[in-house]
Amino acid sequence: MTDTQVTWLTQESHDRLKAELDQLIANRPVIAAEINERREEGDLRENGGYHAAREEQGQQEARIRQLQELLNNAKVGEAPTQSGVALPGSVVKVYYDGDKGDTETFLIATRQEGVKDGKLEVYSPSSPLGGALIDAKVGETRSYTVPNGTEVQVTLVSAEPYHE
């Protein structure tokens, strides 16, 4: 996350991300020990194990920073309990440009909070589509602009609270 933004998370998602952060922080000494062990193997220019351990450390530190920023700027709340209104944490079904036969179902949430099994697409409330749907009621049509500049009409068919 490059710019600071508030992210809505359920308590369950917050706890899951916090546990991941705690595990990554606890794993720091393990990676540091592996780097030291690989460093002792000799010439660092040709030491693949050393470079792999350093790469792993870099990826882990990047994820730690990402999780810290996310959790520091998270708004923790309950998933919506209200049906019929598109809110962060809602599973919505929509159709585009008046084509009622072509529907799409997705979760309005952040990628970090999103569906673990990958069976449901996730659109951020701050994305053009997600933002257009926030607070829309079933049957309401809204418009949003896609990256190529085209305006798209989207109609909310249903909105239900997401349950993990």
Swiss-Prot record:
InterPro entries: GreA/GreB_C_sf, TF_GreA/GreB_CS, Tscrpt_elong_fac_GreA, Tscrpt_elong_fac_GreA/B, Tscrpt_elong_fac_GreA/B_C, Tscrpt_elong_fac_GreA/B_fam, Tscrpt_elong_fac_GreA/B_N, Tscrpt_elong_fac_GreA/B_N_sf
Key word DNA-binding present: yes
Coiled coil: 50-76
Gene Ontology molecular function: any one: RNA polymerase binding
Keyword tRNA-binding: no
Xref: Gene3D superfamilies: Transcription elongation factor, GreA/GreB, C-terminal domain, Transcription elongation factor, GreA/GreB, N-terminal domain
Keyword vocabulary terms for this entry: Coiled coil, DNA-binding, Transcription, Transcription regulation
Record GO biological process: DNA-templated transcription elongation; regulation of DNA-templated transcription elongation
Tree of life domain: Bacteria
Disulfide bonds: none
Record function comment: Necessary for efficient RNA polymerase transcription elongation past template-encoded arresting sites. The arresting sites in DNA have the property of trapping a certain fraction of elongating RNA polymerases that pass through, resulting in locked ternary complexes. Cleavage of the nascent transcript by cleavage factors such as GreA or GreB allows the resumption of elongation from the new 3'terminus. GreA releases sequences of 2 to 3 nucleotides.
Family affiliation: Belongs to the GreA/GreB family.
Protein's UniProt name: Transcription elongation factor GreA
Origin species: Mycobacteroides abscessus (strain ATCC 19977 / DSM 44196 / CCUG 20993 / CIP 104536 / JCM 13569 / NCTC 13031 / TMC 1543 / L948)
